[in-house]
Amino acid sequence: MKTNRPFARASIAFSLFALSCATQHAHAADWRWLNANNQPRPIAIQAAKQLVAADSDGLSPPDYEASKIESALAAASKAPLAPEEAAKLDEQLTQSVLRYANELHHGRIDPKTIRENYTPDARPPFDANALLTQALATGDLQPLWQAATPKAPMYEELRTELQRYLRLRAHPAWGSPLPALPKAATIRPMQEWPGLPLLAQRLAALGYLPASAPQDSRKLTPELQQAISSYQKHHSLKQSGLFDRATSESINITPTERAAQIAQTLERLRWAPLQQAQRMIVVNIPEYRLRAYTLYNYKAIETLPINVIVGRARSNPTPLFNKDMQRVEFSPFWNVPPSILRKEMLPRIQNDPDYIRRGNYEIVGSNGKKVELSPEALAGLANGSMRVRQRPGRGNALGGVKFIFPNNQNIYLHHTSSPGLFKRETRAMSHGCVRVDEPKLLAKFVLHDNPEWTEQRISTAIDKHAGGAVQLKQPIPVIITYLTTVIGEDKNLYFLPDVYGQDKLLQRALEKRPK
């Protein structure tokens, strides 16, 4: 990259100063943020304000020496700085702005350090140095901030919500904890409890009660019940309208802690490759939700929300990564993964020789041919030289369709032979793959560029267990991500449980990173 000459001279001047031999050689014309009188240009004040407000994007102002820079600029506005002080301030502001812009755009840590294995997307390269050089020439930092800000879905809405929670940090409603619940652990309609006035204050501060609503009643009124019900809906709680232990624990979480949770989602939106194609599929593990997006006027618009089932938290968590979907298989065979075969299925086959027939399974040798059940076949299954697969049909574990995005972890999207499981609120119950509730809708979205696959043909292929494999004309990015705060279809903010403990990992990584 071609270096701007004034910036190069400023860097040289500061390096010499650091060696205590540049004071007499430093010239105001070499500095970027100060004028000829060694006082701040307006653009320097703009930069300091942005750094001080870094927490509004989920970043940390102390990381950028924001207060120190703001104070130094304020002092320089009153009295010109000595040359060596001016050089030091100029360099500090340059480095802080560059660090802020890069961390705003790319994030603060490498996601692979917390088991989130994303391949960078094909977005245009972000060159903070070049954009800063241009900004200093024009006196306008807005193009730099705009280019640095992620364009990911939900980012701006979550940023707005973050600022709302930051404003609530000092709210007196969280100045003291709620009193202990009675032994029954649930406050019921019109029951009295001394904590209800404080609860009403918190619900009003969060927007669940009108500011004009009475906040001094010690009874659980219908109005307060409705507010509790709405709060429960947006915080992954059973929506009963009663004030129970889970709701108490949730609303005792302070606005500062909630702001940190939103900030973690903003950090993840900087990593996740959500800006790379005309159409994409995003699976959000904590939400048990799949969203399909289509790009309109350079903005990703959600076109399809679908409930999903994901991997069990302790034993089979669904990995977090991205790959391109390349084909769809109707009426797929289910090739039983070796771990499931070894740990779960082989003991059943050994104890019940009819298990293979009843489940519509077959044993397959290394040559791909079917093998009858025998002691030799059991030995082959045990040593891995043979495998088991389930034939297509009504009881097939994959249902009527499988969506394939090749990866080395054998993860894919598929339907299921047990659709009733989608009615459960907590749906971390698979062996790692992602089960989708509405496979026909997803197939229609995926096969958009394959016009011969009409809605009727898709339905027939799934319902009649016919069809085979279809290669997509245009691969579709699939991103399996982990966002514990989201903006729902109703435009409200939802807080989700940290089902895999990834938020805790991210928080530790942020605390340990170099300052």
Q: What kind of region is each of these model predictions?
A:
Residues 2, 22, 33-36:
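Short intrinsically disordered, low-complexity coil segments enriched in acidic
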Residues 2-13:
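Bacterial N-terminal signal peptides that target proteins for export
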Residues 11-22:
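Bacterial N-terminal signal peptides
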Residues 27-129, 133:
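Cationic-aromatic interfacial patches
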Residues 30-32, 118, 136, 143-515:
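Well-ordered beta-sheet/strand-loop patches within structured domains
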